[in-house]
């Protein structure tokens, strides 16, 4: 977040600024606020922040009950705040804006322009009608009232400490009012009062009324509790008497239980400093008496200390051959991934397992990331522990809760170590990309200490309160995408990418792993159910669309349930053989429409290649033109980068084809480019060559072979740059029936990752320039760039190509 300078004092003449309509928010001077801005306003503020040291706006609260679609000048209060915009960030609902109130202002006039509100405003000055002694007395009463309110809520100490440090009633008002449940009009009235005396006394009145409401609610709750019927009260007393009698009879057992703790601690493998802590807690337990309310919490804490593994067991030597055998038997395909894991284990063996590298397995859902972690544990002969971090928003989930809170628990890391019972398990941190920050802290930041080899030997859990050594643990994290993983966390891990399975690999996995597993889960065997290979191929192609095999497993389970019902009903002859033509009856209609290469040749239509989180896909780029004024229209939910690629492509076409025999009047024609599947957002630079080829094909009226696909980024100088996701894109082209692929020359080395069966059935054309692209796609030689006639030929020199 960049810091912006404050504004210098200015004379009181009217000034003009953009207006930020504030829904359900009133911002006070000297206070900070967060609110959402619409996309247009947010983009303006973001752009201004890039070009200016400080950015301001007028914050005017929207009157209650007004919808965003019904905003008008009359729906805004005229008294607001001059805001210093300190932070603007895109979000799902618009733009998140953080601002600080500078001074109260009045909107002298309001008007709309291009869907935005603007105001001419002037400062609203305070009426200094309060002497210093009276103000000091009111501030003391305000702080006292806030302390009385806060005392009713647990964990409010930090809040009141912040209040005590403030030396201005206006500052306290801006800090406290967002938490007071009063009507919006009342909050606005507090802002509009120019009289310092009236404003401060109204604020004190609001606080006092809020305190009385809280006291009333507590009193009413107490009265409801006191209205328990006499019979229920007697029953409760009888139960209490019974418990007291049992406690009195078993007092010796309780004492012996505490003595057992002492013996267990003395005989444990805890380090000396941990034993010292345990004996300190035990002393509290022994001296607290039978009525000690902390006794259950102390016993839980001592149980945790006794259950945790404190010493490293004798380590087994890593058997690389056995590790390779386990990985090969449990996982088809993923040869490079398995080789990376074997190399990692070899390093551990040479370093005697005292390693600092953390593995991160990244790949689409269902590609075996978690099961790879289980296989590594099996190969090492270690305990396997897995925790899912998807949706975790609270830092306490990682670090634990402090024991001062009721129901406090250790964090998931310490709980996992307790469950493992050994100091060197294989610990899977599943879905680390699904962590998210909230008001309760950032769990991703808490993981930094866990995954940093320099720090995790003294990991601090809030519940445990003493350092715990995690350096012997082999942590393996999994994620679907690294885009949502904070860079400091990503920097601490060694990334292994799992791109997904080919059709042949999925078929092998289904035959060797999934089908036997499904048969066992449904009480079947190979003598009762057989699924033909062709049927498996149809299920893979027509009933699943994924990089992994999780959906395939679900469809096979559905097939097994269908057959089980047939067998139990006596309607099936054994073995029941599932053929491809039977799948419609078993699984219903085909649910996946695979994109396939088009059969017809149409000028302006070219096949491109795309990467998605579930693998690759092909896409079609279509172009057409009509009489107009030289406008370019782009549709199909294209992102900013893809739109820029389209503009670059059009500029290249205009510069290279302007004086050809196929002369095309760009100034009197509009061009429309569309990318089908309009409901799916698309972005990235890799469609550059496809867009350029589609435009060229459209202009010269010559069609591109529908069995040809291409990918690559282009520059204004006509160079073709490398792109990512080559393996997934090539596999998608192979599935779709594409025969030839144009790709950047620098991506030629990425073809090594493509399975050999797919490589052998495709022709690859590596290119470095757009001239090579058109020569291969349209069989034409592209003219040299047109130099404007106004250029002085003798002094022309080509620009440096970045």
Swiss-Prot record:
GO process annotations (BP): cellular response to heat; protein quality control for misfolded or incompletely synthesized proteins
Keywords noted in UniProt: ATP-binding, Cytoplasm, Hydrolase, Nucleotide-binding, Protease, Serine protease, Stress response
InterPro entries to which the protein is assigned, alphabetical: AAA+_ATPase, ATPase_AAA_core, Lon_bac, Lon_bac/euk-typ, Lon_lid, Lon_proteolytic, Lon_Prtase, Lon_prtase_N
Catalytic activity field: Hydrolysis of proteins in presence of ATP
NCBIfam families: lon (TIGR00763)
Record note on quaternary structure: Homohexamer. Organized in a ring with a central cavity.
Family affiliation: Belongs to the peptidase S16 family.
Protein name: Lon protease
Organism: Methanosarcina barkeri (strain Fusaro / DSM 804)
